[in-house]
Amino acid sequence: MVQLNQNFIDTITQELPAHLSMDEFIAACDKPLRRSIRVNTLKISSDDFKTLMQPKGWTFDPIPWCEDGFWISYDEEEQLGNALEHIQGLFYIQEASSMLPPTALFTPSAFTTSAKWQCVLDLASAPGSKTTQMAALMQNQGLLVANEYSASRVKVLHANVLRMGASHCALTHFDGRVFGEYLYESFDAVLIDAPCGGEGTVRKDADALKHWSLDDVLAISETQKALIESAFLALKPGGSLVYSTCTLNRLENQGVCEYLKQVYGDAVQFESLSDLFDGADRATTAEGFLHVWPQIYDSEGFFVAKLTKTASVPRLLPEPKLQKNFPFTTASAKQAQGIKDYFQQDLGISLPDELIMVRDDEFWLFPHEFNAFIGRMRFQRIGIKLADNSKHGFKVRHEAIIALAGKQLSPTAKTVDVSDVEAKEYLMGRDIPLATAGKAQGEVIVCYGGAPLGMAKHLGNKLKNNLPRDLVKDKVLLLPEQTKSL
């Protein structure tokens, strides 16, 4: 049974729109959430994913605001996070409402001028659902800076970015309030899914509101004001900003947006989201924001606001000095050609036309747009590591295969397609015997369902597992195919 604090009920009763009832709100909060996932189109199309999963008993109900998002139902009660297709990065387990902010930011107009969306910031990224959704919307083009303040959550963010094959991300670990100072007017678009009171999450956490207090709401709203101001300062003139929370009170939502408008006046232009998707008007406020109450779409509660920065605004602090000792250098023409030839000739992968960088004996792939950020801020991780160079030649890195071996593969690529049982064995770190012995082929890409799992060494009679030890799984769930009754 959901625990609703009486102080919360008293406060929210005054803010609930007239066309909604408190009884319906409480009833919605007591219902379990519908399961929802987002297909990772960096690796597989939604149609192909449905074709893959429907024989396993999955049914798909489209989420109206996300083209690749679905409410799903299936017979199994196992943890989906252990499913082979999830480990492989074919889908992300993501609550439907949390798909709204990237959709609001990347409206169709965002794609009409490609130059408009070269540098995007996700100010509070972990665990990575919205970051990887934006990476898919950007099709791994341009630069996506993903920031997370919590050190432990940065590790989770990095793991999800790699699993989903997002190759154009640069990860940072800072308090989001410093971005306006360090990266002033540097981004074409900014998403800030702000830390909040979490009032909208009560359907998955029955105790989320047990200790609710107005003092806590007031305190966190001050942090949110500082974050949205920092995000606004980091936004280029003409750029778009989306502010979102998974909470319901006005102080953390409309109040934060109104604060920004009070400080920066006409430089802040609110954009209506009433036409974002069919039925959006049911949750649209007078300002054009989306205030999603749980009973409207049978989802988590959520708030989404979009604004345009119409003019440059003064920076609050002097520009910081450039940082020195950046550990990467641009690869020479000879080095760049060497690594390109290795990927093309040995692996059948055409490297994207991006920056090839070198650090010691490591080769990395950076987005071209990252050049403008060198020395301006410390980054935890940039792009993807392609390979190590040793006296025996190049040794490809797992993350490069996961990110690049999908749509970049040539017909001559050395791949081995495996069954679901063999894929499970591979992900558990085991070698895979080959049914028919043949000539050893050296390094090969192991694939399941048309998407890569990683590398192996073809020894003629078996595939020697080259999966990094830290990625070996103790449990991999194979979702069984459903038999149709006559």
Swiss-Prot record:
It catalyses: cytidine(1407) in 16S rRNA + S-adenosyl-L-methionine = 5-methylcytidine(1407) in 16S rRNA + S-adenosyl-L-homocysteine + H(+). GO terms for cellular component: cytoplasm. The active site is at residue 246. GO terms for biological process: rRNA base methylation. S-adenosyl-L-methionine binds at residues 124-130, 148, 175, 193. GO terms for molecular function: RNA binding; rRNA (cytosine-C5-)-methyltransferase activity. InterPro entries: Methyltr_RsmF_N, MeTrfase_RsmB-F_NOP2_cat, MeTrfase_RsmB-F_NOP2_dom, Nol1_Nop2_Fmu_2, Nop2p, RCMT, rRNA_ssu_MeTfrase_F, SAM-dependent_MTases_sf. Its EC number is 2.1.1.178. Keywords: Cytoplasm, Methyltransferase, RNA-binding, rRNA processing, S-adenosyl-L-methionine, Transferase. It comes from the Bacteria. It is found in: Cytoplasm. Belongs to the class I-like SAM-binding methyltransferase superfamily. RsmB/NOP family. Specifically methylates the cytosine at position 1407 (m5C1407) of 16S rRNA. This is Ribosomal RNA small subunit methyltransferase F. It comes from Shewanella baltica (strain OS155 / ATCC BAA-1091). The gene is rsmF.
